[in-house]
């Protein structure tokens, strides 16, 4: 039985009077590698910002278990966020600090560990992502793929239960991207973490994703959710099929009828709940 880790209900994202996405309702289950996908400018990274507490919804709820992120007090929100690790698109490493010093930042902020203990943890995290021996290297001295892995090591510093990635494959060659995909799978399986990824890289989506939501810029809402591979095979939504097949295979909706959201891999009970649940 699946257990929801993050519950998004009736979420509307807006900048002032401009609505970017509305009425988003979906669950990220524990152990998922959950893909946020859709065309350019549809609001993927903005949704990620809502999930990690950097942007407040215009309407709706983001819940971690039984706790509503934006209704919680500062201490409760801080507790939730300490359970999250984030890898930004640019890796966001401090260029003036070594890799070990970068990883030490959250440990120094949120723990009472000694310098020696922090150094040991930094070395362990770097070894976990294949960077053993690179503690004293600066970001400028390593490749783009290694920077991504170092950023991932820092994201794991506090042993989070959920990891967020914003376009992790951006700027990587196909081999480095494939290696990063394998690393994400290994970490999910070995650490039992939930993973949420913003990406439009189809190879990564199909290689590691088991659940997803598809955002549409034109209708300004989600038009599909579920296993990406199942959506590619079964979706009747033209936009979804075109995206997932690079436009090589079309499946037009019924003539004169706007396509509704595809809910592949979702039980009837869950679908009913997604459509009707209000907090």
Predicted segments with their positions:
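Catalytic Walker B motif of ABC-type/P-loop ATPase nucleotide-binding domains
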Residues: 163-166
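Conserved ABC ATPase "signature" region
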Residues: 115-133
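Conserved beta-strand-loop-alpha-helix hinge in the C-terminal portion
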Residues: 218-244
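Conserved ABC transporter NBD signature motif
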Residues: 60-71
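A short, proline-enriched helix->beta-strand linker immediately N-terminal to the Walker B motif
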Residues: 157-161
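Conserved ABC ATPase signature
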Residues: 138-142, 146
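Helix-to-loop junction immediately C-terminal to a conserved catalytic motif
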Residues: 52
